[in-house]
Amino acid sequence: MTLAASSQRSQIIRSKFRSVLQLRIHRRNQDCTSDSDPWISASGPALAPALPTVPASFLVSPGVLSPEPAYCPWRAPKKESPKNSQHWKEPKVRGNLTYHLYMPPEQRQGPRANLQVERSTLGPPDPPLWEKNSQRPHPRMKPSSAGVSSPSPPSHKLELQTLKLEELTVSELRQQLRLRGLPVSGTKAMLLERMRGGTPPRERPKPRREDKEAAAPWPRLKPKALGTTRLPSTVKASATNRRLKFSGATDPLGAAPAPASVPAPTPSPALAPTPTPAPVPAPAPAPFPTPPASLTLEEELQEAIRRAQLLPNRNIDDILEDQVEPDDLLPPVPLDFPGSFDLLSPSPDSEGFSSVFSSSLPSPTSSLSPSPRALTDSLDWLEALSGGPPLGSGPPGPSIFSADLSDPSGSLLWELLPDPW
């Protein structure tokens, strides 16, 4: 078969199909009174034999076409299949569904509402059989009062299997204990014991203090307990040991050059409040009475230290051999430096800041003592402070601030300071 023959055959088939289609459209437009479908059956038996003659005329003259009949536009929209009409009308019926809106349980209707009502009347569902067999009833879950019990949540959330308790974390165990109304403090072992129904720590009897002392003490309470029990006895023992140490004859301080046979009266109360560098406190006269005619070794040492501080020019042997008399009192230590501290109004001796460092000594009458020995000691002490001759023997010399502290011949300033014994 050549190409021209195949194209001619396809053209004939196409023209035949077109003629049959035009014929059926023409018959449907002409039969306006009948409601039958022209695609299913013919309108009359007279037109049936004419069907095979029409394609024959087209085969003879394929290019000739029959004139198109008049078209009725008002007839076309009424010819619709009942299936198509139902298909397009069904979405309109389903469009009023309100499944996306929330409806309270009181307003629900239909089979779903009835199912929910039945579930609420039956109560919560029972746990499965395997869960019933593996779980034990918890003693804490029993109602202790006869009041109305609250509805219990689902059992699969609260109750846990005994074999799976060790696999839970501490946070999960505490959450379960909170839901059951149990305390959540403690270690994981304590939490597991509470979950299994053991005795909670609230109900355990508190151990007595005797039991605690018999057992190993807690390290945080051990120092405090020992400190409170040993404090009074330690203080009393230490005070007694110190008194015995200074009053004993084998004390190393007893070899001091101070003679113990020198009679001396009891010191006056003015000597008691003076500060001493020795760390040993003075013994109280009430528990250990001393004879009024002699001084104790500790008092003699304190008096020697005080005299050595106030009289730096004297030798230590002279101070120790000197007899202490009640009327022979040493002058008190002055709290202020000799000189005027008024910086605004200059003194008659000098002007400006030099008046602060000038040695304007007080009058001799203010520093006099009842004893001539005390007067001589005070004059020597003032001479040592001022670095010049005694009072009344000449013009005042340079003060202690202008003295050469590095001069070994003069009295040094740090000799006045109390040295540790």
From Swiss-Prot:
* Any matching Pfam family: SAP
Q: Which ranges of the sequence are coiled-coil?
A: none
Where does this chain carry the motif MEF2-binding? 12-28
Under the heading SUPFAM superfamilies, the entry gives:
SAP domain
Q: Where is the composition biased (Basic and acidic residues)?
A: 191-214
Q: In which tissues is it expressed?
A: Expressed in skeletal muscle, brain, placenta and spleen.
Query: Which keywords label this protein?
Result: Activator, Nucleus, Transcription, Transcription regulation
| Region of interest called Transcription activation, as start-end residue ranges on this chain | 208-421
Sequence ranges of Polar residues compositional bias: 230-241
Positions with biased composition (Pro residues) = 260-292
Domain SAP intervals? 165-199
Q: What is the protein named?
A: MEF2-activating motif and SAP domain-containing transcriptional regulator
Query: Organism source for this protein?
Result: Mus musculus (Mouse)
Q: Gene that codes for this?
A: Mamstr
